[in-house]
């Protein structure tokens, strides 16, 4: 009986396989028909667009609107072709059968990376971003529900959730279950190289990731995610989800992505078009502040890295106390500059003290200059009203007398001079403070002992500013000063902002961003265990939560309440690499978050001790050749800093090409992310890349070789524990460590190759 039951089950599976293969064939036929029609449409639209453009350029300006409509149609057709071509490679990845309990109707939906329609109206494959598709990611068989973009909950009974393994026109298999099938497919994908994994992420989005992706669009969030937990993946898919479901509320140009370096930003941007996301804005953090300050910056200036500053200076100007002190100084200066006494002349009272105070309180968020100008305007209006019956010349003289009443004490200063004046004031205040430690009376414990700076450090800081050399924190401070002194209002250009590797910046920058963009919804992602800027970055999230997330206790603010999420599952590394990384964190004293690696085994971590630099170079070359033979497409050589990366590149000779890729056998085949622009090479995944550790943030590689982490390079400290944790968690499949001398203590006890 058991044998017969097994036979019947096998027959059922085989029949289902045939039926699903037939459905796949039908989908492919629809897609090919779509492509045929779209390519014909493209010829027509391209020709029309060319004719309109030529006529417009010849002077027919009335055709401008028609040209814009035609260009929009051209973009739409091109995007549709791209989506259908992508669907040819993998039409769909999931299927759900469910009963809508409100309508009493049964549905069977196939879900893919791109929505595919037949005859332009009939949906044959549902886009993964559609509301009902969330059932696939979160629903379990039986009674459940899904939320529409408008917030309505739809009760359903889920009868089947099926996951497909498809390769072009071939259905290789399918799995029916709740989460096991999704996990099984995920593990299978993770075993592939990096390029393959990136192309198949939508098929393996996990429940906790899906919850974040489909959060309300106006909700701000902080995401603490361990290395490899998919923080960046969640962000780009959330952008795609929002633009798909709320296209009437959000334009791509209103979405801004912030990253710590151009390599990371290019890596993120490269994945957006495949998710139907175009024309978003991307900035490094310092470039964002440069953009916000705009014309208030001097004609000649240079943005410098924070690494050139003293640690005491960095600790001060990256702190919350520092930017809050800027605001207090601005208010104190405003009180000194703007007269608040009643404006009275002879028998006329133009403005009472109460009305002036009331105005300043009501428009507290306006800049000093804006308040002065508006008060002068109000005073002029009051004079005209009160002296309406007076002789015109008398009234004119009175207006002239009080024309600059509220700005008479104001000395016009450049933004740089305002910043210098503040720094002089702060230095004097700290020098006169008994403990010479706190920038403010209510400075918290974390800022204690961070503000003690020598006179030399103060002098060097002010000299740099005066010469026009600004780091990210100088720019943040000046952005806050511009907002408090010069700007006309808040910045409302960006409705959504996504900040990756957030822990690398101090809370000061977030305080300024929030002040300048109070209406923006933020998604802030990071891992405090990966803070590579120990003196200035964040080692916990508490201050940031207070700044960026609205009060969660206010029930009337449900739609805007901020959320803090933790992602503990690591999908990037093998068990062996994850355990190795966890041992590094175990030796540290800072707060860490638990890592839950997906069960995927690989090779043990390789530890290679060599006698000298020449032997290390030979070992690196041998490892590169070995890794290429294993068909790894992305291999990173990670060094402590840029100098070591440049030196390693000069020493490393190209190994012979053993794959199908055409690589010139010169040292140029080993690229240098510190000196040359190699972001395209990294994204394409066809080269061995030499990188300083700081530039690896947010990236991942099939294999990593960590170069010379000996006791001379890395101390047994929390600072270096975070650096090494970042380095080793870049590897998807293999990690090798090559060194001379004594291996640093942070790595010496980690589980390695026997």
PLM features: residue spans?
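Extended, charged low-complexity regulatory segments
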Residues: 1-202, 206, 210-214, 439, ...
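P-loop NTPase Walker
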Residues: 2-34, 38, 188-303, 696-697, ...
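Acidic, Ala/Val/Gly-enriched low-complexity intrinsically disordered segments
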Residues: 5, 437-443, 662-663, 670, ...
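Short glycine/proline-rich turn/loop motifs
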Residues: 183-190, 460-461, 561-563
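Alpha-helical nucleic-acid-binding subdomain
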Residues: 243-498, 503-512, 520-521, 539, ...
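Conserved helicase motor core of SF1/SF2 NTP-dependent helicases
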Residues: 253, 262, 266-278, 283-290, ...
């Amino acid at each position: 009986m058991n044998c017969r039951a097994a036979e019947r089950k096998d027959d059922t599976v085989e029949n289902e396989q045939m039926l699903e293969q037939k459905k796949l064939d039908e989908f492919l036929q629809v897609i090919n028909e779509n492509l045929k029609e779209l390519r014909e449409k493209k010829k027509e639209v391209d020709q029309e667009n060319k004719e309109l453009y030529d006529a417009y350029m010849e002077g027919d300006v009335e055709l401008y609107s028609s040209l814009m409509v035609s260009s929009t149609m051209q973009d739409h057709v091109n995007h549709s072709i791209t989506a259908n071509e992508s669907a040819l490679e993998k039409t769909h990845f999931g299927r759900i059968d469910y009963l809508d309990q409100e309508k009493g109707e049964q549905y069977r939906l196939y879900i893919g990376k791109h929505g595919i329609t037949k005859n332009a109206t009939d949906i044959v494959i549902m886009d993964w971003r559609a509301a009902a598709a969330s059932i696939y990611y979160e629903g379990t068989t039986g009674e459940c529900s899904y939320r529409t973009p408008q917030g309505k909950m739809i009760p359903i009974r889920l009868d089947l959730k099926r996951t497909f393994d498809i390769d072009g026109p071939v259905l290789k298999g399918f799995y029916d279950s709740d989460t096991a099938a999704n996990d099984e497919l995920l593990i299978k994908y993770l075993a592939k190289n990096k390029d393959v994994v990136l192309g198949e992420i939508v098929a393996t989005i996990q429940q906790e990731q899906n919850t974040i992706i489909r959060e309300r669009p106006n909700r701000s969030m902080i995401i603490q995610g361990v290395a490899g937990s998919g923080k960046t993946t969640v962000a780009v898919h959330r952008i795609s989800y929002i633009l798909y479901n709320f296209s009437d509320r959000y334009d791509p140009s209103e979405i801004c992505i912030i990253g710590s370096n151009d390599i990371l930003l290019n890596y993120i941007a490269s994945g957006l078009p495949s998710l139907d996301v175009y024309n978003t804005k991307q900035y490094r953090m310092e470039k964002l502040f440069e953009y916000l300050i705009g014309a208030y910056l001097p004609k000649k200036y240079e943005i410098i890295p924070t690494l050139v500053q003293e640690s005491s200076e960095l600790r001060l100007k990256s702190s919350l106390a520092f930017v809050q002190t800027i605001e207090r100084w601005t208010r104190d200066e405003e009180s000194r500059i703007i007269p608040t006494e009643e404006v009275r002349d002879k028998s006329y009272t133009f403005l009472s003290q109460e009305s002036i105070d009331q105005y300043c309180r009501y428009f507290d968020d306006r800049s000093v200059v804006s308040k002065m100008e508006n008060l002068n305007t109000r005073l002029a209006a009051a004079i005209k009203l009160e002296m309406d019956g007076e002789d015109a010349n008398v009234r004119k003289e009175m207006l002239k007398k009080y024309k600059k009443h509220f700005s008479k004490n104001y000395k016009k200063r450049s933004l740089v001079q305002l910043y210098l004046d503040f720094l002089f004031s702060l230095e004097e205040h700290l020098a006169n403070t008994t403990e010479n430690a706190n920038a403010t009376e209510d400075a918290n414990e974390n800022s204690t002992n961070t503000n003690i700076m020598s006179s030399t450090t103060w002098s060097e800081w002010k000299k740099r500013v005066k010469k026009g050399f600004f780091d990210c924190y100088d720019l943040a401070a000046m952005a806050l000063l511009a907002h408090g002194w010069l700007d006309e209002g808040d910045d409302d250009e960006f409705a959504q902002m996504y900040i990756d590797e957030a822990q690398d910046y101090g809370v000061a920058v977030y305080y300024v961003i929030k002040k300048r963009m109070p209406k923006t919804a933020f998604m802030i992602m990071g891992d405090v265990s990966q803070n590579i800027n120990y003196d200035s970055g964040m080692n916990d999230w508490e201050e940031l939560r207070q700044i960026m997330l609205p009060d969660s206790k206010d029930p009337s603010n449900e739609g805007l309440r901020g959320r803090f999420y933790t992602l503990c599952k690591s999908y990037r590394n093998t068990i062996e690499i994850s355990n190795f990384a966890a041992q590094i964190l175990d030796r540290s004293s800072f707060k860490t978050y638990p890592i839950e690696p997906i069960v995927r085994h690989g090779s043990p971590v390789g530890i290679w001790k060599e006698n000298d630099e020449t032997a290390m170079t030979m070992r690196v070359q041998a490892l590169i050749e070995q890794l290429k033979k294993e068909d790894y497409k992305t291999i990173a050589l990670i060094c402590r800093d840029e100098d070591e990366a440049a030196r390693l590149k000069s020493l490393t000779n190209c190994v012979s090409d053993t794959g199908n890729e055409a690589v010139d056998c010169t040292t140029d085949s080993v690229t240098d992310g510190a000196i040359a622009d190699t972001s395209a090479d990294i994204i394409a995944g066809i080269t061995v890349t030499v990188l300083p550790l700081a530039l690896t943030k947010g990236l991942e590689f099939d294999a990593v070789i960590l170069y010379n982490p000996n006791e001379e390079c890395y101390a047994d400290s929390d600072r270096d524990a975070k650096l090494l944790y970042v380095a080793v968690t870049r590897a998807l499949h293999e990690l090798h460590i090559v060194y001379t001398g004594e291996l640093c203590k942070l790595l010496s006890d980690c589980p390695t190759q026997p």
